[in-house]
Regions:
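Intrinsically disordered, low-complexity basic tails/linkers immediately adjacent to helix-turn-helix/homeobox/MYB/SANT
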Residues: 57-65
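A short, Lys/Arg-rich alpha-helix, primarily the initiator
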Residues: 1-23
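Short alpha-helical DNA-recognition segment
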Residues: 19-38
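Short, charged recognition helix plus adjacent turn
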Residues: 38, 67-80
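The alpha-helix within a helix-turn-helix
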Residues: 15, 26, 56
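Residues in the recognition helix of alpha-helical DNA-binding motifs
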Residues: 14, 28, 39, 69
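Short, basic-rich loop-to-helix N-cap that marks the start of a DNA-contacting helix
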Residues: 43-57
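The DNA-recognition helices of helix-turn-helix-type DNA-binding domains
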Residues: 32, 43, 70-74
Length: 80
């Protein structure tokens, strides 16, 4: 699994856990709906740290909590 897939999967998981839609996340995080859609559809190759931080704010979690999953613990460095 690459970076963008792992991030998209984590966002979907958090939306499901909190019972919010991607549109609702756009409202609470101040991240444009088009940006969230791009991340979830795998069109965004590398979501920026500021965007992920805003999404975390919308979820009311820290960056550490966002990345604190087994998927990210086993991440290998991607060199391209």
């Amino acid at each position: 699994m690459d970076t963008r897939e792992a991030i998209a999967r984590r966002i979907r998981e958090l939306c499901r856990q909190r019972g919010i839609t991607p549109n609702g996340l756009a409202t609470t995080s101040a991240v444009p709906q088009a940006t969230i859609k791009s991340i979830l559809n795998g069109e965004s190759k590398n979501p920026g740290a500021v965007t992920i931080k805003k999404l975390c704010d919308g979820f009311e979690i820290t960056l550490g909590e966002f990345f604190s999953t087994p998927e990210f613990d086993t991440w290998e460095q991607e060199i391209k």
